[in-house]
């Protein structure tokens, strides 16, 4: 007997459904640690601090310039290759498919971090794991 479970993306398996997981190649001039620090700071500096009424009046385009806290925590986790568990499937994938694995980061973030996600997509060689 075989059980088949339909999923939307690989991130559905490893995180809750409001998460986005990106595999990012560091194609910047920053070191891996500098890039990690930058992503955390970028996320903090783009948090929306206004009130709900202001948020409701904003267009979706304006909202995409901010990161919001998700109802369940609104987390951001950035891991270098060396910080990944050896059994983690993405680390295994990096080992099998990519040269120079230490140039990769795994970014796990809540979908409501629109500004951070947009920066990752626009500035890093990033793959959303739902596309793997």
Task: Cite the ranges covered by each PLM segment.
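Short, extreme N-terminal segment that most often corresponds to the first beta-strand
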Residues: 2-30
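Charged, low-complexity surface segments at secondary-structure and domain boundaries
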Residues: 19-24, 39-44, 74-80
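Charged, amphipathic alpha-helical linkers/stalks
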Residues: 32-50
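Low-complexity intrinsically disordered segments
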Residues: 48-132
